[in-house]
Amino acid sequence: MTSPMRHLASCRAVLLDMDGTLVDSGAAVEATWRAWARDNGLDPATVLAVCHGPDAATTVRRFLPGIGAAELARHVAAHLERECADIDGVIPAPGAPELVAWLDERRLPWGVVTNAHLRLARARLGAAGIEAPVIISFDDVEHGKPHPQGYLLGARRLGIEPARTAGVEDSAPGLAAARAAGTLVVAVGESRDGDVVCRDLHELRRLLIAAADRLP
């Protein structure tokens, strides 16, 4: 059994990032951050270069470092309203419907770990037609990605130890969180920083099927 197969054969649960991994929300994410940048006199291209992965508060603090707690909360709340209103064009990522259908068919526990607030996570997943049995959102943790708290909580909710859980991510903060939690790190997309590397969720599903078929 090859190394990726050996890794995946040990998995008994799957936790997936939302934006960029399970859901293609790129257009909506960029539109809302572009508008925020313009509202605050910032270069949209500079903001867009770093906004994928971190939670909204982290991005706001990065560009408005002297901001107080009340003003930060106002920015985050306004941004959340804009994000929840702008879900046009949010679609499932390539292979997402097929992967979650296979996980459900196999009765393999799975869920979503996201730096988005729960309200936004439900809106985007709903727009993409994906019903996640477990959602760990930014509202559930004290520290978002790259902190491992979300993945540790997700594994606990699924009832599977992190070492036997695949953490599927596309961004550097997410990959760092999945790794720090002790999960099997699956990098999807352009990143190569994973125990298993897949072009998309179609490929991940094929690898999971092959790994399951090779079990004794």
Model regions and ranges:
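Residue-level marker of regulatory loop/turn positions in helix-turn-helix DNA-binding domains and
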Residues: 92, 113, 143
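Hydrophobic residues in well-ordered beta-strands that form the structural core
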Residues: 24, 112-114, 187
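N-terminal helical cap/lid subdomain that shapes the substrate entry/recognition surface
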Residues: 4-106, 117-122
